[in-house]
């Protein structure tokens, strides 16, 4: 049996996001085009005495925008961010809620700050998931994926598989994580926080900048439901563990290479068909070098690659999804976003870092992510041709 | 005669995933394929109990002592399950684990270390374990499984989901077998249930059976 030929096509559409750059997709895309960034200098004595860089959402604006929506009850900051991200999708696809429609929530730490309060119940990721799914009136049991920094993009892959194997017809996928003392202090203890806004792939890069965001997308097997101006088929996906180290990536990029290779095999394409790569690019020495190894092994060293971390910071469980949503929105206009912060090549191998917005016909996009626990994910998206609809 | 042969051929081609081995660690006891292998009744501390299991089964993996409680439980359960089939482990075997409380014990430890005002300092040795999927990474490293890994969180054991997702992995050719399970530990309350599913003869991979076996 040729599995590839018998696979049900699965599409993504209606991507949205909430970041410090804007509380909707349009504001985020315009922000990037204008060269604005979500990262700013912050002063918070609770975190550390010296100022630090981070991408932190304006909570006043968030609360004000959220209060204009119809949701009743008490919600945490992260729940508000997630509901703001899925509000439009929930309205657009309400008609599919009773047609085997699931929800996947990707988050690494959820409402982790609840650990230091008396309200311990809100720590549990399922609690957060249930609040979000109840708020939009979806009755199926929410699925929480908590798989470090690949969670956001892996969630699309899980949705695709559960649709292709016949268990579901549609999924709302939402990812989110906060800028928390919990995570900030942890990365500080690793000496992995950059003293300046992060500089992916640059010679002077010295670590990550953290951020907070939520992002969402609708995944479906029903092509007719997708928006004419933004529809992508998920043509290949794979997540292969490095089996090497729990906090450092494989030096040879083994897991990422295998993930990309498997995704290309499933899509029945070779590397030359890929128009651009939306990479992980955290700006740590090890991560960026590992990606260079993997992309070179996959013969992708000439393909334009960009990291969005210098715009949004590392948004953990939201990152892969946020970056996919932004990349697809640029691809709608046949544009490749810039990889900000890159001046001098800082890798031992060549890569085609796309350092300014480029006009190019974009048909196939590769999104990858890598994270703690040795995790890697690669997903290939292909633009839907309008007249096929 | 021909019809019977065809019937068997068809069945062989469409053989379903079955549970071929399973391991439980709960209530101070260890079971493999339903058979009790170790008991420390009366041992109420998780940390002493799991150390006792580690020693009893000669797991010989010093990294064990560095791990957070979730990884200790995961590496112990998976080792007891996999040592029996060691020569026959498929390097492409996927790992799909789930629980309710993520890695709450080490999260609390990290949170306490950063909540002491000026005295606060985080330990990288703790922080690195503050993600539930680290347990998948530890199992992958020990058994060299370069494979699909995912960690899910539900309010309770969710056999329907594990069946749907594990079956999708084999159906879509992402892996030939899946190490699946529920792995929950909060202080001294714990329950680990891991099993291997594969297209081989075994216990039917059904919701009823999983509820019975956990």
Each PLM stretch: what is its role?
Chain B
Residues 3-214:
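Conserved "HGTGT" condensation-loop signature of ketosynthase/thiolase-family condensing enzymes
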């Amino acid at each position: 049996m040729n599995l590839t030929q018998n696979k049900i096509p699965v599409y993504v559409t209606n991507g949205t996001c909430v970041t410090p750059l804007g509380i909707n997709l349009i504001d985020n895309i315009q922000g990037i085009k204008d060269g604005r960034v979500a990262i700013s200098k912050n002063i918070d004595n609770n975190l550390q005495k010296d100022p630090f860089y981070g991408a932190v959402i304006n909570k006043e604006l968030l609360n004000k925008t959220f209060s204009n929506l119809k949701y009743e009850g008490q919600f945490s900051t992260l729940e508000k961010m997630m509901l703001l991200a899925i509000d439009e999708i929930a309205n657009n696809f309400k008609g599919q809620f009773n047609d085997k429609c699931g929800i996947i929530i990707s988050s690494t730490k959820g409402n982790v700050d609840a650990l230091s309060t008396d309200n311990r119940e809100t720590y549990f990721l399922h609690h957060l998931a249930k609040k979000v799914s109840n708020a939009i009136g979806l009755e199926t049991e929410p699925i929480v994926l908590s798989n470090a920094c690949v969670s956001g993009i892996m969630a699309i892959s899980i949705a695709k598989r559960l649709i292709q194997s016949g268990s579901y017809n549609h999924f709302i996928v939402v990812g989110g994580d906060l800028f928390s003392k919990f995570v900030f202090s942890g990365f500080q203890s690793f000496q992995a926080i950059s003293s300046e806004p992060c500089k992916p792939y640059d010679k002077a890069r010295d670590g990550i900048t953290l951020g907070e965001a939520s992002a969402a997308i609708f995944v479906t097997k029903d092509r007719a439901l997708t928006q004419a101006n933004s529809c992508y088929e998920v043509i290949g996906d794979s997540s292969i563990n490095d089996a090497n180290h729990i906090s450092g990536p494989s030096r040879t990029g083994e897991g990422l290479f295998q993930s990309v290779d498997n995704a290309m095999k499933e899509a029945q394409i070779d590397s030359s068909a890929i128009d651009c790569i939306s990479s992980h690019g955290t700006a740590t020495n090890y991560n960026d070098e590992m990606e260079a190894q993997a992309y070179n092994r996959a013969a992708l060293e000439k393909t334009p690659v960009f990291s969005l971390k210098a715009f949004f910071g590392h948004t953990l469980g939201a990152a892969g999804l946020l970056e996919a949503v932004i990349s697809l929105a640029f691809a709608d206009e046949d544009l490749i976003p810039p990889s900000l912060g890159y001046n001098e090549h800082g890798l031992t191998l060549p890569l085609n870092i796309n350092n300014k917005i480029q006009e190019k016909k974009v048909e196939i996009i590769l999104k990858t992510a890598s994270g703690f626990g040795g995790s890697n994910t690669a997903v290939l998206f292909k633009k839907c041709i309008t007249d096929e609809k | 005669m021909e019809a019977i042969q065809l019937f068997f051929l068809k069945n062989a081609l469409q053989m379903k995933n079955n549970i071929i081995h399973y391991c439980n660690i709960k209530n101070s006891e260890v079971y493999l394929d339903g058979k009790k292998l170790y008991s420390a009744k009366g041992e109420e501390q998780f940390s002493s109990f799991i150390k006792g299991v580690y020693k009893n089964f000669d797991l010989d993996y010093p990294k064990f002592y560095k791990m957070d409680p979730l990884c200790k439980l995961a590496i112990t359960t998976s080792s007891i399950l996999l040592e029996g089939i060691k020569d026959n482990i498929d390097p492409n075997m996927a790992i799909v684990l789930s629980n309710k409380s993520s890695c709450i014990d080490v999260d609390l430890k990290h949170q306490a270390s950063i909540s002491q005002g000026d005295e606060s300092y985080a330990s990288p040795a703790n922080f690195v374990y503050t993600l539930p999927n680290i347990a998948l990474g530890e199992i992958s490293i020990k058994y060299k499984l370069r494979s699909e890994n995912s960690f899910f969180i539900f309010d309770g054991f969710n056999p329907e989901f594990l069946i749907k997702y594990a079956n999708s992995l084999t159906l879509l050719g992402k892996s030939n077998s899946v190490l699946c399970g529920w792995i929950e530990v909060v202080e001294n309350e714990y329950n680990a249930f891991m099993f291997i599913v594969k297209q081989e003869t075994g216990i039917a991979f059904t919701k009823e059976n999983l509820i019975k076996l956990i």
